């Protein structure tokens, strides 16, 4: 079997869950360059990119996007830089609520390689579809100016960021044995354990699995906020789960979700947006997990692993 024949399917090798970005005084950017280093977990010969404006209120234009082999976090081997195109075009407009998938990029990749994805937003762009995540494999950089085809971002005018805007998922065309594991949840999963799980699989020789993070801080299973104060806490599980588990090559999902349903309600006398009527019963939670998550996952052929809710004794709603 030659190299081309051994690659048979698309599998997600990196992913996040864009949501409503925090409401800051400035929600627009122009002439902005984003660069995201990404660890490759499979061998493959093609790569493609999903971009999302799922929570955007205005269309956004990606003026240019490129991928290249990373030298370090900020630098790319210029000889390897390739344009990411969309129907043959080097730019694309993503409508509010929309998503786009790039053309395939021919690129010989090996497990353990690092690539950098660079996105240039030349026009005024509403930065309202992104996610804040942390971990040793989750860092990005931004600078003003178009560096999409440049080797290095300028040291004195570049800042690091843990905000990942618009880039949703990266798929690689790889071997049939490979599959994706989805880690779904809230701020617990937006923190660093999925990155350490990915590193652990790499170090221990589990070379057929990728870890795809779908985490939005503050989200609940059964309810969502309709006020601007907590807009960034995102959609409830009923709206999220089916979309976020639509992952190429996925074989299983770890669900670590539900603690916010319990700890958010405090009573209107404390916080007008967090009435005690939002507090679910145990049966509400069981039904929510079963009906919204487990049934959906199994209909997609996914194995389901449920994380235990973390201890909350002493929390304000512990005995409610």
List the model feature ranges, each with a label.
Residues 28, 149, 223-224, 275-276:
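Generic signal for short, ordered secondary-structure residues
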Residues 43-44, 65-68, 183, 194, ...:
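Small-side-chain structural scaffolding
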